């Protein structure tokens, strides 16, 4: 199995798709990497020459923040917003949606499962 940034990328997939298994690399970034290294995006990982793999590895390590470094940076940014008490930091602290979504209904992923309210009855059918 080929490794890029400490991640095993699947051998059977096309290089363009396989690179997206690395945190911080999506389809667009993957296409940019392959264009700059001169590797055909339709090649399967198993068919890649070792020199192509080395080119991709060096490009990713030299030019991109991926995996652990990127995760640490994202967490540091969130922590900083929480500490300075800005609106987004408050939303993170309370476990609510950060990007302006409605919360009257929906937002169950951020808020977690519904909690029953004591004494409140569901409206019955008439």
Curated annotation (Swiss-Prot):
Keyword line: Ribonucleoprotein, Ribosomal protein, RNA-binding, rRNA-binding, tRNA-binding
A cellular component annotation (GO) from this entry: cytosol
Gene3D superfamilies: 1.10.8.50, 30s ribosomal protein s13, domain 2
GO molecular function: rRNA binding; structural constituent of ribosome; tRNA binding
Gene Ontology terms: biological process: translation
Basic residues composition-biased segments: 108-126
SUPFAM superfamilies on file: S13-like H2TH domain (SSF46946)
Presence of the UniProt keyword Signal in the record: no
Region (Disordered): 94-126
Function field: Located at the top of the head of the 30S subunit, it contacts several helices of the 16S rRNA. In the 70S ribosome it contacts the 23S rRNA (bridge B1a) and protein L5 of the 50S subunit (bridge B1b), connecting the 2 subunits; these bridges are implicated in subunit movement. Contacts the tRNAs in the A and P-sites.
Subunit structure: Part of the 30S ribosomal subunit. Forms a loose heterodimer with protein S19. Forms two bridges to the 50S subunit in the 70S ribosome.
Family according to the record: Belongs to the universal ribosomal protein uS13 family.
HAMAP family per record: Ribosomal_uS13 (MF_01315)
Protein's recorded name: Small ribosomal subunit protein uS13
Organism: Streptomyces griseus subsp. griseus (strain JCM 4626 / CBS 651.72 / NBRC 13350 / KCC S-0626 / ISP 5235)
Originating gene: rpsM
């Amino acid at each position: 199995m080929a490794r890029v940034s400490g991640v095993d990328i699947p051998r059977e997939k096309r290089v363009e798709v396989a690179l997206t298994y690395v945190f911080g690399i999506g389809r667009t970034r993957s296409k940019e990497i392959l264009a700059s290294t001169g590797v055909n995006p339709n090649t399967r990982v198993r068919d890649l020459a070792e020199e192509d793999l080395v080119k991709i590895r060096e490009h990713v390590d030299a030019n991109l923040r991926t995996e652990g470094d990127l995760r640490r940076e994202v967490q540091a940014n969130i922590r900083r917003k929480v500490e300075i008490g800005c609106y987004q930091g408050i939303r993170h602290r309370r476990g609510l949606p950060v990007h302006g979504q409605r919360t009257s209904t929906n937002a169950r992923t951020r808020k977690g499962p519904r909690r029953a309210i004591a004494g409140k009855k569901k409206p019955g059918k008439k």
